[in-house]
């Protein structure tokens, strides 16, 4: 079973990882999801595929109210990264999904409407989170075209998705 573990805490600014699941079925790719919180603002990075949604949701729910997640960051378009989007939108229909402009017509097949998606230009963008800004940094072709990393300059943590996978 996946568990949520805090990696960084500074007041109301937190980073947590939903770590690998040693009990997962061998035919399912395992991923690590990260929850970044600043005040009342929360972003979930690469929330995973449909197959692992129940264990990710359970792990997050044990430490955090998942209805407070109002942003998702998708490093790229692969189903193991973002196909659970539709299920997260059932938890909070107001979630905004930040992803490369390149995938704005592909990822909606997993759920959402035009208003769900916030396109990231090739050069990257700053994403507000509470009173700080995270930086979507281009990492094109390090795993996929339109791939992005996410940098938190306050915590000095870089989310690199599944580069090298």
Regions from the language model: what does each represent?
Residues 11, 91-93, 113-114:
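Short, structured coil segments at secondary-structure junctions
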Residues 137, 160-161:
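Short, conserved beta-strand edge motifs with alternating hydrophobic and charged residues
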Residues 3-60, 149-160:
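Conserved beta-strand hairpin/beta-sheet module of binuclear metal-dependent hydrolase folds
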Residues 5, 98-147:
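Metallo-beta-lactamase
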Residues 48-49, 77, 140:
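Structured beta->alpha junctions
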Residues 52-98:
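Active-site metal-binding motif and surrounding structural segment of the metallo-beta-lactamase
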Residues 164-165:
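Amphipathic alpha-helical blocks and their helix-capping loop/short-beta junctions
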Residues 43-46, 70-74, 136:
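Short catalytic-loop micro-motif centered on adjacent basic/acidic residues
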